[in-house]
A protein has these predicted regions:
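Second-shell loop/turn segments in exported
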Residues: 8-11, 58-64, 74, 106-108, ...
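His/Asp/Glu-rich, glycine-adjacent segments
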Residues: 28-150
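Loop/turn elements at helix/coil->beta-strand transitions in domains of secreted/extracellular proteins
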Residues: 2-6, 32, 79-85, 129-135, ...
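Short, structured active-site-proximal loop/turn typified by the sulfatase FGly-forming signature C/S-X-P-X-R
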Residues: 1-33
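Structural recognition of the beta-strand scaffold that forms the well-ordered cores
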Residues: 6-9, 23-25, 73-76, 83-88, ...
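Metal-dependent active-site segment of extracytoplasmic phospho-/sulfohydrolases and closely related
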Residues: 1, 162-204
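Active-site neighborhoods of enzymes that stabilize oxyanions during catalysis
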Residues: 216-326
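Surface-exposed patches in mature extracellular/periplasmic domains of secreted proteins
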Residues: 6-13, 87-89, 255, 314, ...
C-alpha cells in the first residue's frame, strides 16, 4: 500500500527463467544479450565445444560469462567503483568482462528463503565504502512448485506465502536497522506460469522424422535444426498443426525482438497457451512458461518501495528491459548500451 506497483511486468520472449533474469539485469533482449533460452547451442564449437548452454545443478555453462554479450548491472556498478553483492541471481557467479560482484554465492538450492534474506541483511551491516550499492537475490520455490503442481495448486500458493514471509523478514530487518526508508527495494518475477494439462500435448514425431532434425527444447516451444539444410521442406511439414504457430528464423513477430542471434535455430515451433510440444517419452509438467509474452499469464510482477518510488502508486504494465536503466538511475551509475529506456 505504501509503495509502487505496475499492472504487470512484461517478459521478453522466450518467457523462460534465464533469458528474463538476464534481460532484467542488462536491459537487453535475449537476441542481444545472448542467453536466448534455458537450453541452446552455439555454432562456435571452438569457443564453447559441442555442449549446449543449460541450467540446473552443476551447470558449468551457467558459470561461464563468455556466453553473455551484454553488461549486467553488477558489472556496471563494480566498474564505477561501487560494490555489488548477490545471493543467487542467475549467472552472478560467473566472471563477466573480467569482473565479478564484490561478494556472491554459487547457487545452492538447499538454502531457504529466510537464509537468503539474512545474507542480504548482513551485507547491509557493512560500514562505509564496504557497504554495497546493489544487492540481489532470487527465490526459486514458487517456480518449482508451479511446474510440479500447477500455478493454482495449494503447494504453489504456499510457496508464494513463504516468499512473502521472507520479504517480510527482510522488511523487518531493514526496520530494525532504521534503514527501511533509505533502501530502494524492487520485487519482480522473471515470468508467469500457466496450467498445462496432460491432455493438451502435440507429439511432434507425428509430423517429422526425428532422425532428420535436432530438436532444442520441449514444452511451450521447440527450436528445430534440419540436419540436411532442408529448412523449407521441414518448415512446410510443420505448417497448420493445430494449436501451434511455426516461424522461420527472422520471421518471428516483431515484438518478440528475436531472430538475429546465431544461437537461434532455423525454425521455431510455438505452442498456444496451455499446450505442450513433446517427443516420445517426454512428460510435460502441470504448469509451464515460455509462451508468447503477450499472454497475460506470462507476466511477472513489479512492486517497489523506497525513497525514489511514489507511495500508493499503481501504474500500467512495464517491460522488464526497462529495469536496468531504472536501477542505474537510482544508483547514479552510467548505464551500458541497452534496449531499454527510463
Amino acid at each position: 500500500a505504501n509503495g509502487s506497483k505496475a499492472d504487470g511486468l512484461k517478459t521478453v520472449y522466450p518467457s523462460k527463467t534465464f533469458p528474463n533474469h538476464i534481460s532484467i539485469v542488462t536491459g537487453n533482449y535475449p537476441s542481444n544479450h545472448g542467453i536466448i533460452s534455458n537450453y541452446f547451442y552455439d555454432p562456435d564449437t571452438t569457443k564453447f565445444g559441442k555442449r549446449p548452454f543449460y541450467i540446473g545443478a552443476g551447470s558449468t555453462a551457467a558459470q561461464d560469462g563468455r556466453w553473455i554479450n551484454a553488461e549486467p548491472v553488477w558489472v556496471t556498478v563494480e566498474k564505477q567503483s561501487k560494490r555489488a553483492m548477490i545471493m543467487f541471481w542467475p549467472m552472478s557467479d560467473a566472471e563477466i568482462m573480467g569482473i565479478r560482484p564484490s561478494e556472491y554465492y554459487v547457487y545452492n538450492e538447499e538454502s531457504n528463503n529466510k537464509e537468503r534474506m539474512d545474507q542480504i541483511l548482513s551485507w547491509l551491516d557493512y560500514n562505509g565504502n564496504a557497504r554495497p550499492s546493489f544487492l540481489a537475490s532470487y527465490f526459486s520455490s514458487v517456480d518449482h512448485n508451479g511446474h510440479d503442481h500447477g500455478p493454482n495448486a495449494t503447494q504453489t500458493i504456499e510457496a508464494i506465502a513463504e516468499a512473502d514471509q521472507a520479504i517480510g523478514h527482510l522488511i523487518d530487518g531493514l526496520e530494525a536497522r532504521n534503514i527501511l526508508d533509505e533502501v530502494n527495494i524492487i520485487i519482480v518475477s522473471d515470468h508467469g506460469m500457466t496450467e498445462t494439462p496432460s491432455s493438451k500435448y502435440i507429439n511432434i514425431a507425428e509430423y517429422l522424422n526425428l532422425d532428420d532434425v535436432v530438436i532444442v527444447g520441449r514444452g511451450p516451444f521447440m527450436e528445430i535444426r534440419p540436419k540436411n539444410d532442408n529448412v523449407d521442406e521441414i518448415y512446410q511439414s510443420l505448417i497448420g498443426i493445430e494449436h501451434t504457430q511455426v516461424f522461420k528464423k527472422g520471421e518471428t513477430p516483431k515484438d518478440f525482438h528475436y531472430g538475429d542471434n546465431n544461437r537461434i535455430e532455423p525454425i521455431l515451433l510455438l505452442a498456444d497457451e496451455h499446450w505442450s510440444l513433446v517427443t516420445p517419452g517426454y512428460s510435460s509438467s502441470f504448469g509451464s512458461h515460455g509462451y508468447d509474452p503477450n499472454y497475460r499469464s506470462m507476466n511477472g510482477i513489479f512492486v517497489a518501495h523506497g525513497p525514489v518510488f511514489k507511495s500508493g502508486f499503481s501504474g500500467p504494465e512495464i517491460r522488464n528491459v526497462h529495469l536496468y536503466e531504472m536501477m542505474c538511475s537510482i544508483m547514479n551509475v552510467i548505464p551500458a548500451n541497452n534496449d531499454g529506456s527510463l
